[in-house]
Amino acid sequence: MLDVNFFDELRIGLATAEDIRQWSYGEVKKPETINYRTLKPEKDGLFCEKIFGPTRDWECYCGKYKRAPFKGIICERCGVEVTRAKVRRERMGHIELAAPVTHIWYFKGVPSRLGYLLDLAPKDLEKIIYFAAYVITSVDEEMRHNELSTLEAEMAVERKAVEDQRDGELEARAQKLEADLAELEAEGAKADARRKVRDGGEREMRQIRDRAQRELDRLEDIWSTFTKLAPKQLIVDENLYRELVDRYGEYFTGAMGAESIQKLIENFDIDAEAESLRDVIRNGKGQKKLRALKRLKVVAAFQQSGNSPMGMVLDAVPVIPPELRPMVQLDGGRFATSDLNDLYRRVINRNNRLKRLIDLGAPEIIVNNEKRMLQESVDALFDNGRRGRPVTGPGNRPLKSLSDLLKGKQGRFRQNLLGKRVDYSGRSVIVVGPQLKLHQCGLPKLMALELFKPFVMKRLVDLNHAQNIKSAKRMVERQRPQVWDVLEEVIAEHPVLLNRAPTLHRLGIQAFEPMLVEGKAIQLHPLVCEAFNADFDGDQMAVHLPLSAEAQAEARILMLSSNNILSPASGRPLAMPRLDMVTGLYYLTTEVPGDTGEYQPASGDHPETGVYSSPAEAIMAADRGVLSVRAKIKVRLTQLRPPVEIEAELFGHSGWQPGDAWMAETTLGRVMFNELLPLGYPFVNKQMHKKVQAAIINDLAERYPMIVVAQTVDKLKDAGFYWATRSGVTVSMADVLVPPRKKEILDHYEERADKVEKQFQRGALNHDERNEALVEIWKEATDEVGQALREHYPDDNPIITIVDSGATGNFTQTRTLAGMKGLVTNPKGEFIPRPVKSSFREGLTVLEYFINTHGARKGLADTALRTADSGYLTRRLVDVSQDVIVREHDCQTERGIVVELAERAPDGTLIRDPYIETSAYARTLGTDAVDEAGNVIVERGQDLGDPEIDALLAAGITQVKVRSVLTCATSTGVCATCYGRSMATGKLVDIGEAVGIVAAQSIGEPGTQLTMRTFHQGGVGEDITGGLPRVQELFEARVPRGKAPIADVTGRVRLEDGERFYKITIVPDDGGEEVVYDKISKRQRLRVFKHEDGSERVLSDGDHVEVGQQLMEGSADPHEVLRVQGPREVQIHLVREVQEVYRAQGVSIHDKHIEVIVRQMLRRVTIIDSGSTEFLPGSLIDRAEFEAENRRVVAEGGEPAAGRPVLMGITKASLATDSWLSAASFQETTRVLTDAAINCRSDKLNGLKENVIIGKLIPAGTGINRYRNIAVQPTEEARAAAYTIPSYEDQYYSPDFGAATGAAVPLDDYGYSDYR
């Protein structure tokens, strides 16, 4: 068997009949499958043992040879080779066809490859192949030319004979008529009778003339057809063809069916044809040139690949191994079989019948009919349903052909090659495990025992609890007491992977150290729920076991949950306290005026109270019940660092050192909170709202190693749960308070609504205006009720606590519960002008309940659609970007993009750019950042983290040039410096990181949060697409809905205002030709933008516009942007537009992820003029390949090719990839394979998908080449240590062995030398 790791590329081509016979182990001659009595395969049938190998190991068909010693012998009685039965999975057979057939992929695909090659229309081709017309395959022009005059003379003689015969017959008939008339006259017959006779005579003479004329026309037809006869000419009229053969058979050959196609291909001169087509392209115009281009693609493919076009017509059909199309017996004596067997049986039956008919010398028409049926049966085998009605099995179900086995979600590619099921896995319901550390999970005992069974069995044998593996297995199955101790030992330090479907981003699979727990549920750490998007309402998770040492090392170092705190999309922590924990910390750090033990200043004879010498003393007071944790106190602190401003004031330049005392005015709760933070973190004297907690953890992630952050969030979690329990926050009916002012507020608005209603009835308002007015009124009412509610609720109300702390929910939900529901929408997405006035606490009326259901149901339907759409978007994004891998450290390019850090306000202060987090943050600086005095603030090549950005802003720098993947010069993949910091680790990205996949996941994962609907803005204007449809529109590079024109040139605008349309003319500044935009619908509205004088207003007559400026409301067409402003601008445009959609939903994704995808969309160039290169005009070429080829041609002194960049949608870009395996497994499988086979395409196996399909390690992460070939070289100390002989007393282990926490060791602590 071929080892998959030893080949570098995979080529696909056309198989000729010779190849098929070479693969085959014998010909299948009979349609029989299995003998129904003996259940053994029939000889020469579809399951024949002689061809495909024995059905049982080392046993021939007749039973003469049994068992392994006879290996390799071929039995002389039954002819079966004695070998393993698994060869029935590998050995192929073939069927020798009695007549050739065409391969349906090449004839019926769009475009028809056979048609392009032979220059025949697909309709004509179909007529020939399915025996409806004859085609001329060759003409002996020389012989015809030489003997033309002789033949013409013969033809003239024949015509003369016909004419003479006609004239003779007419003469005789005329004489007979004369005689008849004379006779009648003599008898004195009436004129009537005479007229009848005359008419009859004339009619007969007319018939004679017509008959002769028909004969002459036929001769003329035969002659003209013969003189113009040329190869590839179609003759549909059978009689005409027969005549031609009878008369001039020796001058030409013709036939019908696939044989004629085979002949035509045999006589086809590829080189000459390619030359003549190139000629046409050089000198031709219009349709002719286009057709020649398309044909040249196919012809050149055969010319360059060395494929023989004969492979498109088959003389033999391969039969796949029988184990791949099995036949199994069901209970009840019936058989279940693969559809392929039925399809093969039809082919064999028809083929055998055709052979018999040919042997019998049957009439041509019967033989042709049988050949047509054979062609149809082979078509059905290869691609059932591609032409005509599909062949159906029982119950009118179309049979699954070979193509169907590859196509679609259930096909071979997506079902078995890209999505395999995994051994050593289990799944169960998850429950919360608040006692766990961040890197741990609770694994049910029974599940762990089953997962680790082989390890436990081996260990039982090692420890002599069992004699052999078999008894060990028995012990495990009977769950003997010793087994549990061994299991504890085996699972220690062996990480497991937990996965929750749907795995939307890479944090959907993380590694944990298992702890054995009772019960059958997996326990999950509460902080990783965010990353998994898990909750405990019945979610299930799967467990997988990494087996090899390398897999365990990767799981521990790269996938352990405590090393994956940051989100790969935004680089901000995901493992944050949420829900109960937030409530707990919020409660703990709240300050309640007048609470027990509050600080009282000294007054008169009372000394001050509520002052404590240390946190320990305060805690003691709290335990005795004289101090509340939420009361304001003064406390002397020595182990907590003061806030920055106090530190500067108290300790000056030297700064605070642990042990320095300072006095804090705070609450005991806040002191306890700060003790959870790492030593040396400035004291935070605030109420811990969710946002504040997030900011602190963010800051920790920037400044401290991951291990510290992990320990801190774990402590915060414990404290959060502890205090949430003690806070007693619960929700009961009594907590939902209805504001007493609600009725009077609603009465007031009811009056206003009545007024509007009256105006409408008087006709002062139309229907739309009335609705708008009512909607406005009730929106105000709802807000006012909300306001009243807010004032009415006390601060310690649990519902308000939950909302205010940011734990969950928002004020709208509180208002719905206790205030009023407000306006709801109808199924069209418009507001219903009657509001829901009740709150859920009071209960809804029947009508209110009914109108409320619209929105609720639409929400559910929307969510389901969104999930599917978003999943499909992610799949396309992954597909287009899967080969973007970091391949080198630095591509040394000078180029980059400019990002804004801040804007100067009119008074000179800097206003920080709101999107700095997703644009400049975590990038590499492209040039030195210099302030006005010329001092370098941050050097080129520095990573921009929060401290660096703050430094730049402090120096007054408003924009910087950063490296970006859009300008990266690496030919395949990207370089680490252009990509910048990896968002998930906070360090420069590693070589081998699959940044394409990460980008696709980061964009796709929040996809489900985006809205589905297109929202209406202002009612009158065009719908502006938003949400998920807009993201799809951008990535697919479609022309947007409500497309807005952009200025082609810089110049002055002349605006002509028509009745229904605008006409905009731009007069260019450089005096060029005027640009006119005609018939622009007024519904679209003119664009508002900043003018030269700084004012913001609508575009009007005489305004000055820059090139690329949008003139109307709506969205610019990216293809237009590319045409007018070039590739750089369109890249920036796409990134900006995609970000707008995500920001509207409050989703933070870094620009670099979108840039990776956009880079893939602009990878190709379309060739305009091929110069001296091999490229075909109009073809799409990878930019790197285009530039390399041009350099080569110029170096040889030739003309370079001219091309222009082209923007491709992600689906198109995925299908245009160089890897045919990846494209075929994505969409349109048959089309991709057809094309790849004709071009003899080679797959270089650069991307991830192709390697997964063939089962190689993926070329990313530790699978990249440079990491595969590492040899470990021991240091001198290691060598010395290896040769010292330990004495008996020597500690074999380090003294602290066994005291380890099991937490991951931070990689930062190890010094790595350069790994090359």
Curated annotation (Swiss-Prot):
Keywords in alphabetical order: DNA-directed RNA polymerase, Magnesium, Metal-binding, Nucleotidyltransferase, Transcription, Transferase, Zinc
InterPro entries named among the record's database cross-references: DNA-dir_RpoC_beta_prime, DNA-dir_RpoC_beta_prime_bact, RNA_pol_asu, RNA_pol_N, RNA_pol_Rpb1_1, RNA_pol_Rpb1_3, RNA_pol_Rpb1_3_sf, RNA_pol_Rpb1_4
Residues annotated for Mg(2+) binding in this entry: D535, D537, D539
Cofactor: Mg(2+); Zn(2+)
Reactions mediated catalytically: RNA(n) + a ribonucleoside 5'-triphosphate = RNA(n+1) + diphosphate
Pfam families xref list: RNA_pol_Rpb1_1, RNA_pol_Rpb1_2, RNA_pol_Rpb1_3, RNA_pol_Rpb1_4, RNA_pol_Rpb1_5
Free-text remark on how the cofactor is bound: Binds 1 Mg(2+) ion per subunit. Binds 2 Zn(2+) ions per subunit.
Binding, Zn(2+) 2: C891, C968, C975, C978
Binding site for Zn(2+) 1: C60, C62, C75, C78
The protein's role, per its UniProt record: DNA-dependent RNA polymerase catalyzes the transcription of DNA into RNA using the four ribonucleoside triphosphates as substrates.
UniProt cross-references to HAMAP family, sorted A to Z: RNApol_bact_RpoC (MF_01322)
Name of the featured protein: DNA-directed RNA polymerase subunit beta'
Native species: Mycobacterium bovis (strain BCG / Tokyo 172 / ATCC 35737 / TMC 1019)
Lineage start: Bacteria, Bacillati, Actinomycetota, Actinomycetes, Mycobacteriales
